[in-house]
Curated annotation (Swiss-Prot):
CDD domains: SHMT. (6S)-5,6,7,8-tetrahydrofolate binds at residues 176, 180-182. It catalyses: (6R)-5,10-methylene-5,6,7,8-tetrahydrofolate + glycine + H2O = (6S)-5,6,7,8-tetrahydrofolate + L-serine. It holds the Pfam family SHMT. GO terms for cellular component: cytosol. Pathway: One-carbon metabolism; tetrahydrofolate interconversion; Amino-acid biosynthesis; glycine biosynthesis; glycine from L-serine: step 1/1. The keyword Nucleotidyltransferase does not apply. It comes from Chlamydia muridarum (strain MoPn / Nigg). This is Serine hydroxymethyltransferase. Its main location: cytoplasm. Catalyzes the reversible interconversion of serine and glycine with tetrahydrofolate (THF) serving as the one-carbon carrier. This reaction serves as the major source of one-carbon groups required for the biosynthesis of purines, thymidylate, methionine, and other important biomolecules. Also exhibits THF-independent aldolase activity toward beta-hydroxyamino acids, producing glycine and aldehydes, via a retro-aldol mechanism.
Length: 497
């Protein structure tokens, strides 16, 4: 069989269009298809799948071929526990150089005083953040007060007493239904809730916005050690100067989780008091989502946390992933370009266009609109559960995710809303005109879903009905859009057999 690479090289021969990234990508697929056919075919099928849907899950995006290629190499074979130039293993000088460059790039991009690029995910970054705060603000002062040098010097009885004491310190963060994340401690099954006494704050049910006066009142009453700000499903911006003042007034550390909007900070969309870096003590993020990097985490912090972050291993990590750190460095460098800044601004413009067209179609949005990359549609008035809406949109080629809303009576599994985002479609090059078309398609589908009832007359958790005429029209309109804005256009799907 003629290889993908052979076909590609023949096609571009003499056209001056050769892409080294495409050559490398196709060579890798060729090898896998030949040597490990089932794995190679699954990768090809995933590419086809991603090219056949409008990806509107707010936490997803498309990384560049450069980012992907940086992960596929022998760096994965190297153990490098520790921090740059201070490892628990020998022969790490090349990994040191890569990680150091990644750290310095992160600090320059965000204007941060210190950075740790080792976390494998956003959840790991959040765990490192809370462990760093506990170590810095609770554990170390307690050990010193007891007259010991390190926690390892404590006798067993005093160590157990200190552990019990640490779990009583308070953490105040956004609840899950108000747009917070599982790792913000307000969900008891998550490990974060077991490290501290975690308390929630909620959005105002009338405005669906965070009320800083209410947050300040709760903080003053409970005097938490940590105040968490950030979101995974909240469509407005936050004022970090105000949140910093609330934290200072109650003696709390301000930790900001900017996993969803890090790309908007890097791209210069969130500036001034909307940029958390100058105000927060610790900032965490993923490196995918709006940053368009590999799946991974990143922690940025004030200088006083630098030593603790450099001890991520053994604090809560073992060996980092040097191949992913290399890809993070590539993504962070891409985020420093003018093109990325244009991209970040277009992400928000596209979200606002979606919101405007949805509202013209009579759909209700939480908070009445959006100031960032996402929006949440309240489906209550349509009588359509979020899970059914998710399924029906998936069936016509639009990927979204069901999402709970404040005081959601339907629970976390069924939900009363759906969350949508524009990062991935913007990466494909779509603009406001395309967003109008997308919004009109979605609105028409949502308004024509019939909910199938069970024998007792209650709404089904998994089934909805959409007429074939509406479904076919939606699929064709989606296909037309995807045909004009293909994912990785340099990769010819016709050769992927």
């Amino acid at each position: 069989m003629t290889s993908l690479l052979d076909k590609y090289l023949r096609n571009i021969s003499g056209k001056g269009q050769q892409s080294l990234a495409s050559v490398a990508y196709l060579a890798a697929l060729d090898h896998l298809l030949h040597s490990f056919p089932s794995i190679g075919q699954s990768i090809v099928q995933e590419l086809k799948s991603q090219r056949s849907r409008l990806k509107m899950i707010a936490s997803e995006n498309f990384s560049s071929l450069s980012v992907q290629l940086a992960m596929g190499n022998l760096l994965t074979d190297k153990y490098c526990e520790g921090s740059p130039f201070k490892r628990f293993y020998s022969c790490c000088e090349n990994v040191d150089a890569i990680e150091w460059e990644c750290v310095e790039t992160a600090k320059e991009l965000f204007g941060a005083e210190s950075a740790c690029v080792q976390p494998h995910s956003g959840a790991d970054a959040n765990l490192l953040a809370i462990m760093s705060i506990i170590t810095q603000k609770i554990q170390s002062p307690a050990v010193q007060r007891l007259g010991y040098k390190t926690i390892n010097d404590l006798p067993e009885q005093e160590y157990e007493a200190l552990k019990a004491e640490m779990s009583q310190y308070k953490c105040l963060g956004p609840s899950l239904n108000s747009g917070g994340h599982l790792t913000h401690g307000t969900v008891r099954i998550n490990v974060m809730s077991k490290l501290m006494h975690c308390l929630p704050y909620e959005v105002n049910l009338d405005t669906e916005l965070f009320d800083y006066d209410v947050i300040a009142k709760i903080a003053k009453e409970h005097r938490p050690t940590v105040l968490i700000a950030g979101y995974s499903s909240y469509s407005r911006r936050l004022n970090f100067a105000t949140l910093k003042q609330i934290a200072e007034d109650c003696g709390a550390v301000l930790w900001v989780d900017m996993a969803h909007f890090a790309g908007l900070v890097a791209g210069g969309v969130f500036i001034g008091e909307e940029n958390p870096i100058p105000y927060a003590d610790i900032v965490t993020t993923t490196t995918h989502k709006t940053l368009r990097g590999p799946r991974g985490g990143l922690v940025l912090a004030k200088k006083e946390y630098s030593d603790t972050l450099n001890k991520a291993c053994p604090l809560m990590m073992g060996g980092p992933l040097p191949h992913v750190i290399a890809a993070k460095a590539v993504a962070l460098k891409e985020a420093m370009t003018i093109n990325f800044r244009k991209y970040a601004h277009q992400v928000v413009e596209n979200a606002r266009t979606l919101a405007e067209i949805f509202q013209r179609n009579g759909l209700r949005l939480l908070t009445g609109g959006t100031d960032n990359h996402m929006l949440i549609i309240d489906l209550t008035s349509l009588g359509v559960p979020g899970r059914i809406a998710e399924d029906m949109l998936t069936s016509v080629g639009i990927a979204v995710n069901r999402n709970s809303i404040p005081s959601d009576a339907s629970g976390q599994w069924k939900t009363s809303g759906i969350r949508l985002g524009t990062p991935a479609l913007t990466t494909l090059g779509m603009g406001s005109a395309e967003m109008e078309e997308v919004a009109n398609i979605i609105a028409k589908v949502l308004r024509n879903i019939t909910v199938r009832r069970n024998a007792e007359g209650s709404s089904s958790k998994s089934e909805g009905v959409l007429s074939e005429e509406i479904a076919q029209e939606a699929r064709q309109r989606v296909a037309d859009l995807l045909g004009r804005f293909p994912l990785y256009p340099e990769i010819d799907l016709e050769t992927l057999v």
